[in-house]
Amino acid sequence: LYQKALHTPCYTKLSKGESITASILKDVHWKETEKIITDQKTLYEELCVSRQDIPVASMCAIEYYEDSLLPLARLYNLERELDQALQEKIWLKSGGFLIIQQTEAFVAIDVNTGKHSSKKDAEENYKQINREAALEIARQLRLRNLSGMILVDFINMKNTNDQSELLQYMGSLVRSDPMQTVVVDVTALGIMEITRKKSAKTLAE
């Protein structure tokens, strides 16, 4: 680039950043993607051409959507989905819920029993809620593109056997994550430590 600059007139563009199309293709997890739909004609054409350089992308359909009466964003309720994806509180099917908070130093995730507060077989209920929470946490890490240090406060994590089982389960869930994700350990206070490689901005950013 330096050598090029030496022999180029002033105000000449020496380089340009990655195109939107290239950025999109780079971030697609092709093995898990069946179809890409866009309502932007130019982007559609660029995607069709660019994906030819990616062998694994050939199995993914690229569709151009055109309907002036029903925009693509409204068809898939994108605004509502995006709003939900940015909420701190996420309800679980069991009645429990997660609280996800991002700070500059780490991501804190708190698991709560919520509406699921039956005292009968409490220990077993806690284990079920924790497993359900682990599954949702693995999904949220990818959905929100959370990275760095992630600290998870599961319910009643005092029993070492329960800790070990949950560690293994969480490890199996993040194994399919395209970003390097490591379930480190459970601290003396019962907090699970997870690290996830940073690749781009979070959904909130």
Locate each region found by the language model.
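OB-fold/S1-family RNA-binding modules
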Residues: L1-L98, T103, M179-E205
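Conserved glycine-centered short motifs in functionally critical loops
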Residues: S94-E205
